[in-house]
Amino acid sequence: QNAVPTTSVAFQATISTGNPSKSSGQTVKPANQEMWDNGYGGNYNTSNYRFTAPVAGMYQFSNTHSVYSSPNGMWAGIKVNGSTLYVGTKINDNVGSGDHNMTCYVTTQLEKGDYVEAIDYTGNSQTYSSGASWNRFEGSLIAAYK
């Protein structure tokens, strides 16, 4: 049974000021600044960069991943419970200098207590672009279950 939640659940987090370095390979997005975190006392953790589902239901998430220059392959992903990985847009080769960004969207079913992370991949070390315009992890509850 679907139910209309009595409390909304939505968050957006970004990389705060500065442009941190990003090592090569898969990295959990260091989104350490909440833009908002509504519902059930907040469900996004700025220390471990995880969203934890407060109720069972269908959720939608997006990850926008941006770096400054010459990534040797790049993609944005969403990972559920440390194992199930959804990958969005992807480039396989070095595409030259300048800003590059990728986005991943996913709608998924979560149980109460499941966690979700934004995963950023580059084939070489990079520098993140900062701010919500360039790097953000966001999500919301679409439908709760009784």
Segments (PLM) and residue ranges:
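Short, surface-exposed tryptophan/glycine-enriched loops
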Residues: 99-115
